[in-house]
Amino acid sequence: MKSLEPKKLILIGASTGGPAHIEKIAAALPENFEAAIVVAQHMGAEFIPSFAKRLNERSKLSVMQAREGDALQKGVLYIVSEHAQIIQNGEYLVFSIHTNPNAHFNPDINTLFLSAAHFVKGCEIVAFILTGIGDDGVEGCIALEEGGARCIAESEKTAVVYGMPARAKERGANIHAKDLYEIIEIIKQFGA
């Protein structure tokens, strides 16, 4: 597969306890960041715009809610809602966003991660499963890992709820747990 834009992609999935952790990540990132960041944080769709606005006020990066057809750009942190997927349009990765009345989560982390797994050969990807209840994102993390992406789960020490990260670590052969401050450093290094 030929090289895609953006060349580096960071995926973050979170649930209970995630907003505060995502705020810490967003606030720590420097300008001139060389990766696109896509965040799937479980919350009602009506709260996504205000969450994106709050992050944008605290980050040196541009933060916005992902919209249908938006091309992913380096140095931008996107907050997804609904049934968001990443698809290819020429040499660019773009968002495809649909409503799914049967979805258990908003947004669905597995849907996002599974869609990105198709592009591991054309784009360098690192994915993170942060604090949260249940197992959303685990299946997608495993698909990313099997394709060659690096996947990291938040540690029990810093996760508010060690459900999703624990399931990812249990099921993924190479998924390791890291404290939140270590995750922030990994993200900063990846986007340098």
Identify the meaning behind each predicted range.
Residues 1-192:
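Conserved acid/base catalytic micro-environments in cytosolic active-site loops
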